[in-house]
Amino acid sequence: MRTVLLTGFEPFENEPINPSWEAVRALDGERIGDAVVVARQLPCVFGAAIDGMAALLRELKPAIAIAVGQAGGRTEMSVERVAINVDDARIADNAGAQPIDTVIAAKGPAAYFSTLPIKAIVRDMRAAGVPAAVSQTAGTFVCNHVFYGLMHALATPAGEGVRGGFIHIPYLPEQAARHPGEASMSLESMVRGIRQAIATTLATEVDVREQGGQLH
């Protein structure tokens, strides 16, 4: 049986919970097709988060690795297209670090694309009743940091054949209640969307070709 690694983050920026961890841990141990889900939490800390991801890849040897993170203010599940090789933190991480214009991997490329079937995932999430879209930026905080670190690891011989990517999710309703005017999504919808992302990835070797870009 194949393994699907899901990661979520600990809370950050004074939030008592992080929806990414709440959503992925709800799927821990679940069987989807011929795969079993293993969910693990990463620290919201530059460096340590990539180290944690690398250790999980070595330990679990997953067929698929999907990192999930909170993006307060987004209105739908965002299936990320690209990770960029820069840290530029608007706020400090949970260890107090705030790197600015810092390269993630000195010998790494400027960017990596997700190897998930991102457009098929969005199509199937929407068909399952979950608002979703392809996103062209994962930001420059710890989410992008982990996304880049994941894809950098999968670009090595040890990562050959492993598919990886990143999904951002909105606030939970109880978080949005503390941020008037911000969008939210129920935990049930988040879990359903991530489950669908896994099922679609397992079933899709070549992504669909359909519109998923933005003008700005």
UniProtKB/Swiss-Prot annotation:
It holds the Pfam family Peptidase_C15. It comes from Cupriavidus pinatubonensis (strain JMP 134 / LMG 1197). Belongs to the peptidase C15 family. It comes from the Bacteria. This is Pyrrolidone-carboxylate peptidase. Its EC number is 3.4.19.3. The active site is at E80, C143, H168. The gene is pcp. Removes 5-oxoproline from various penultimate amino acid residues except L-proline. It is found in: Cytoplasm.
